[in-house]
């Protein structure tokens, strides 16, 4: 936050005392260049800002600045800031720089600006001037200065990479642009300081949310054509043991886990049902992107990937579980270590059995460790966990794995003796559980709009009545948000992350979305007649005529709402979900599914689906 902005009639300059050259933005064509001829005698129009990037909408190109931030945390001497306020300014000579947004008359452009503001205000955007937050500690240590710029950043978690794509391309020609690129993450950093025996321990959990297929719960499921999984997160647990003598002797241990949606073509289609229709494409359609997804994971994390599947063995999740299991066993590049645990059947009481099953893989894979400036161990096995949403069940399992690793780390470095266990220290264990529960809540809020379910298991290690009641309320909130509000939020993701680019769009969506008053007639009739009938039954003795007078329109309105329920879902307007534009529910697709069922019946005498 030490950058200044100076506005001139034909250009805009960003300067910083710590940078060799100023960044010049041409107000005619929006081109970026480096300049050493800035007149610093001119008072800055804006000071103490941080460049977020540049985004072009339908008419104008804009510079996005962080104008206010808070100190969020400090890790290994590096300050981490959270962006609190943003400012969006048009890059053009036809509008005043500071008040340009007030002079924009185009309704569609204003709607895009509103969506961009919504995108910037969602979640937590974190950055550090001295630490690349896109990389885990292990990745940072293995990088060398000989790598090019594009190899330094971990683009999987570079949240504002679309806003910086122009500068990144220019860096390939002139490395001077590199110092103006500030990678930011959408994520959370939770830190707690604890005292264990005679040791001062600092526990930190860093969450990195991937921008590659980001969005809301029902509009981003499965995997996209590029092999990027929905709701993909990297969670790094760092434990720092302070030396009483010198900082150089500090021990730092970290363990990284990942989670993401099942990398297959599948969806749950919003239709106002509490559990929407689950649609799964044939496995052959998903095999290519499945392999691409895990190949990219192998490139980032190595070939030793452990896949933990928490889907139900029976019920509506069974076809998805079976298909995922088959693809895992088919995949040979890289080969996957597959572990299955039916959480809803086994529950949290059998977690020790699950940990015993993967114990050898965790011990073999180790963790990253450094003592002072020397690296003493490297993590070689990485666990990828998923359930249906990669939220509630996944939180419980990843917390259990993290606790197992923490126990192992503290034993290895001598903080705990071989006969001791972390479970014996209630105060430290409570801090550990709280920090992981908050991490789960953050990821869940990004994806669903509510804290995670089963948070009481993460916090207390067992189910509680109060926790079950909170889950009930959060389920209701999820239903409302996911059905009636997530469409616009998904639009904000697609616009801010470059999935939809207004200047390059051939079809202009109907923005902003307006509902004709006739759409509210049926819900109004249903609600009004239901209230009247309820009042009459509770406080009066209505005649048959009165009952029929209100019951008939109520039933008709209810039937209309049932058969037109998808029209009342808040759908995205910029980019339709894959299943909505890919013919998943076309007559041809239904005919194919019916044909497959008939074929199964003729072959095995059963309509039961075998995935």
Curated annotation (Swiss-Prot):
PROSITE patterns assigned to the protein according to its UniProt record, in alphabetical order: SAC
InterPro entries: SAC_dom (IPR002013)
Organism of derivation: Schizosaccharomyces pombe (strain 972 / ATCC 24843) (Fission yeast)
Short name of one Pfam family: Syja_N
Gene Ontology biological-process entries: phosphatidylinositol dephosphorylation; sphingosine biosynthetic process
Name of the protein this chain belongs to: Uncharacterized protein C3C7.01c
Domain SAC span(s) in chain numbering: 51-351
Superkingdom of this protein's organism: Eukaryota
CC per GO annotation: endoplasmic reticulum; endoplasmic reticulum membrane; Golgi apparatus; Golgi membrane; serine palmitoyltransferase complex
GO molecular function, one term: phosphatidylinositol-4-phosphate phosphatase activity
Entry similarity comment: To yeast RSD1 and S.pombe SpBC19F5.03.
């Amino acid at each position: 936050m030490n950058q200044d902005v100076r506005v001139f009639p034909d250009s805009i300059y960003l300067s910083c005392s710590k940078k060799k050259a100023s960044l010049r933005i041409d107000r005619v064509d929006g081109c970026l260049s480096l300049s050493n001829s800035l007149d610093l005698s001119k008072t800055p129009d804006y000071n103490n800002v941080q460049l977020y990037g540049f985004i072009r909408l339908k008419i104008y190109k804009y510079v996005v600045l962080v104008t206010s931030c808070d100190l969020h945390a400090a890790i290994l001497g590096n300050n981490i800031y959270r962006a609190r306020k943003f400012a969006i300014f048009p890059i053009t000579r036809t509008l005043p720089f500071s008040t340009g947004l007030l002079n924009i008359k185009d309704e569609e452009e204003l709607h895009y600006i509103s969506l961009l503001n919504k995108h910037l205000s969602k979640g937590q955007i974190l950055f550090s001037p001295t630490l690349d937050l896109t990389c885990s500690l292990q990745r940072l240590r293995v990088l060398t200065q000989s790598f090019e710029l594009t190899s330094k950043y971990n683009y999987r978690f570079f949240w504002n990479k679309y806003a910086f794509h122009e500068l990144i391309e220019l860096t390939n020609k002139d490395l001077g642009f590199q110092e103006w690129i500030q990678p930011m993450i959408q994520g959370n950093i939770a830190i707690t300081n604890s005292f264990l025996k005679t040791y001062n321990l600092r526990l930190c959990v860093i969450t990195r949310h991937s921008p590659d297929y980001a969005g809301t719960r029902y509009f981003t499921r499965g995997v996209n054509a590029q092999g990027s999984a929905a709701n993909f997160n990297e969670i790094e647990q760092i434990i720092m043991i302070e030396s009483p003598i010198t900082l150089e002797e500090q021990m730092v241990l970290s363990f990284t886990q990942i989670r993401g949606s099942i990398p297959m073509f599948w969806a749950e289609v919003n239709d106002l049902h509490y559990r929407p229709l689950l649609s799964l494409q044939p496995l052959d359609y998903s095999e290519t992107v499945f392999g691409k997804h895990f190949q990219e994971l192998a490139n980032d994390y190595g070939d030793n990937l452990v896949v933990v599947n928490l889907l139900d063995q029976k019920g509506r999740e069974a076809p998805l579980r079976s298909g995922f299991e088959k693809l895992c066993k088919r995949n040979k590049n890289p080969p996957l270590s597959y572990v299955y645990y039916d959480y809803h059947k086994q529950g949290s009481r059998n977690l020790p059995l699950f940990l015993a099953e993967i114990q050898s893989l965790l011990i073999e894979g180790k963790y990253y460790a450094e003592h002072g400036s020397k690296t003493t161990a490297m993590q070689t096995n990485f666990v990828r966990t998923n359930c249906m949403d990669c939220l509630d069940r996944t939180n419980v399992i990843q917390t259990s794995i993290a606790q197992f690793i923490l126990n192992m780390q503290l034993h290895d470095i001598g903080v705990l003796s071989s006969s001791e266990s972390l479970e014996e220290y209630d105060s430290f264990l409570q801090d550990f559980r709280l920090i992981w529960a908050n991490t789960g809540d953050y990821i869940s809020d990004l994806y669903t709009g509510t804290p995670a379910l089963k948070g009481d298991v993460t916090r207390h290690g067992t189910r509680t009545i109060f926790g079950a009641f909170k889950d009930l309320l959060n389920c209701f909130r999820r239903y409302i948000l996911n059905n009636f509000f997530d469409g616009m939020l998904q639009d904000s993701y697609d616009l801010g992350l470059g999935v939809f680019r207004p200047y390059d769009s051939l079809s202009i969506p109907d923005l902003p979305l307006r509902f004709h008053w006739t759409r509210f007639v049926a819900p109004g009739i249903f609600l009004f007649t239901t209230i009247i009938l309820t009042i009459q039954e509770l406080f009066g003795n209505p005649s048959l005529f009165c009952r029929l007078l209100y019951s008939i329109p109520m039933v008709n309105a209810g039937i209309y709402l049932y058969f037109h329920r998808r029209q009342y879902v808040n759908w995205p307007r910029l980019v339709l979900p894959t299943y909505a534009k890919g013919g998943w529910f076309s007559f041809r697709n239904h005919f194919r599914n019916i044909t497959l069922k008939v074929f199964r019946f003729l072959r095995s005498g059963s309509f039961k689906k075998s995935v």
